[in-house]
Amino acid sequence: WRPSAPIVGLGNVQPSLTVRRDGSVVAWMRDNGPPPHRLLRAESTDRGETWTPAVDSEIPNPGSGAEVRVLRSGEWIFIGNDVENGRHSLAVWMSQDEGETWGFRRRLVEAQAGQGSFSYPSLLEARDGWLHATWSEAIGGRETIRHARFNRAWIRAAGLNP
C-alpha cells in the first residue's frame, strides 16, 4: 500500500469512488470551494496512482456529503443534496453512461429552505435489486435518521432530468 498523488481542486473533500468497465476510477467529491457549487469529479486511469484535477460535474452540491454507486445493471446512482445552497432537498440521480450524464433525477424529500435539513446520505443495492437509502434529517428541532426503499423504475418514472 502507498498513498496516491493528491486530487487537486478548489474545495474538494470526501470522495466517493466508482470504477468504470474499462477499469478507470472516478472520484466524486463534495464541493467546499467557490461557486458554482457542483459535485466535483476527478479521474484516474492507473488504479488511483494519479488523478486529473477536480472539475465541476452537472450535479449541484452545497458542500454536503454525497455517494455514488455502480449498480449491478451497470447504471450509476448518486444520492445527495441537489441544490447549490442548503440541505433542504435530497435526491437520487441515475446515469446510464457511467457518469458522463445523469439522465434521471427523483427527489426523495424536500422542505422549504431553512425549514429542514437532510444530510449524510448513504445508499446500497440489496440482492433483490431494491435500493435502500438512509440519511440524517432535522426538521422543527427534531433530528432522526430516515430510510427509503425504492427501485430503478421509480427513479425513471420521474422522467428525464430537466
Which ranges hold each PLM region?
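Asp-box/BNR beta-propeller blade signature and adjacent active/binding-site loops
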Residues: 1-162
